[in-house]
């Protein structure tokens, strides 16, 4: 098996939201300004503790995500990103991306984020249809989505990923096509399509979501977008999400924050989900880390397969052998099951996700 990757990506989990709303999944925190500031300081403390352990990896991409990280103090977010640049070995062309909700995008926020040299924004628009944003109870409207895009353009931030949802209550193929037409018309560099997986009433079922997904893929192809990984569409290779591309090429994962997951130097880690514990002990792994496990060759081989399918859409057998050695019975079994399910096609010495597989792995 080849040496452990020296490339890595860094994910910073900020699960804060302004208030509890329907149609959300995952761990979310609602806190006042003091709690948010305390969390950002805890992230900086964890980064200082973790960075020396990760060397000699080179960070190809940094992604700040989670709940609504753009509601945090823009200046403090900028300071956090500057800390990460000083503590970790970032590649010269490192992608630094931030998930943002439309109503938080403006001159103050873009100025603060700019201090941290954010060069990619993931705009979580969900939709541009007014009735669908109302159905989702989002704290912004379609006008604010348009304004956010104008501000991003004004600040010459051309690497924008517009994240949209399918499966919204009341959504139809026609309404999704209108959204895609409107968004494609502003010529974003990247589009992300994500299923609405919340258990709230009204969410479209899996069969209906599959129809919407297939129709969206066909329409985006006609607009010149290429789907390079499940739910990820780019006009050209230059604007593919480097965070995903790097994971699909075997980069290690370093996670900071509550619930963060890491996988590097042959070990996997999961951080605590307890805010009080994390805020008080983020710099102390014996308290901040809830679980740790060693990755044997079998686990690393499965991770290779799953990351390359999830973030790269597939892989060549020769790449697998180069990275992991001869295919084990466990890996062969998993791939055979995916083939039988119709999610993976094995052809010409490569395993690739089918259209059905792209839909399944986007979920």
Regions found by a protein language model. Give the residues of each.
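C-terminal scaffold of the Radical SAM
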Residues: 2-7, 26-53, 57-325
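Short beta-strand motif preference
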Residues: 10-12, 123, 353
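Local cysteine-cluster metal-coordination motifs and their immediate loop/turn environment
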Residues: 11-28
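Short, Lys/Arg-rich nucleic-acid/phosphate-binding segment
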Residues: 231-234, 347-351
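Extended hydrophobic-aromatic, low-complexity segments
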Residues: 317-318, 329-331, 346
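Short amphipathic alpha-helical interaction segments
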Residues: 325-340
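A short, conserved structural fragment
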Residues: 339-349
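Accessory beta->alpha helical hairpin/"wing" motif in late/C-terminal subdomains of nucleic-acid enzymes
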Residues: 348-363
């Amino acid at each position: 098996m080849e040496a452990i990757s020296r490339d890595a990506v860094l994910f910073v989990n900020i699960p804060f939201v302004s208030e509890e709303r329907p149609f959300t999944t995952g761990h979310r925190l609602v806190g006042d300004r003091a709690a948010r500031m305390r969390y950002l300081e805890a992230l900086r403390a964890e980064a200082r503790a973790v960075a020396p352990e990760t060397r000699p990896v080179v960070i190809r991409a940094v992604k700040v995500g989670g709940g609504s990280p753009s509601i945090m103090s823009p200046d403090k977010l900028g300071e956090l990103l500057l800390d990460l640049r000083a503590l970790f070995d970032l590649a010269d062309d490192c992608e630094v991306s931030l998930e943002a909700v439309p109503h938080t995008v403006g001159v103050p926020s873009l100025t603060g984020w700019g201090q941290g040299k954010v060069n990619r924004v993931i705009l979580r628009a969900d939709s541009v249809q007014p009735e669908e944003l109302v159905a989702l109870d989002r704290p912004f409207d379609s006008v604010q989505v348009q304004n956010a895009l104008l501000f991003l353009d004004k600040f010459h931030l051309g690497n924008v990923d517009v994240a949209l949802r399918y499966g919204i209550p009341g959504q139809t193929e026609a309404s999704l096509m209108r959204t895609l037409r409107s968004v494609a018309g502003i010529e974003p560099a990247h589009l992300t399509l994500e299923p609405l997986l919340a258990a709230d009433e009204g969410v479209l079922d899996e069969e209906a979501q599959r129809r919407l997904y297939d129709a969206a893929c066909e329409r985006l192809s006609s607009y010149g977008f290429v789907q390079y990984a499940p739910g990820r569409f780019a006009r050209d290779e230059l604007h593919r999400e480097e965070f995903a591309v790097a994971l699909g090429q075997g980069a290690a994962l370093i996670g900071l924050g509550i619930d963060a997951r890491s996988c590097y130097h042959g070990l996997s880690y999961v951080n605590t989900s307890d805010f009080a514990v994390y805020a008080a002990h983020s710099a102390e792994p014996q308290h901040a880390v809830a679980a740790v496990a060693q990755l044997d060759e079998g686990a690393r081989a499965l991770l290779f397969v799953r990351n390359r399918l999830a973030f790269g859409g597939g892989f060549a057998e020769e790449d697998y052998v180069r990275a992991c050695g001869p295919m084990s019975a466990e890996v062969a079994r998993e791939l055979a099951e995916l083939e039988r399910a119709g999610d993976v096609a094995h052809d010409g010495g490569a395993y690739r996700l089918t259209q059905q597989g792209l839909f399944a792995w986007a979920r």
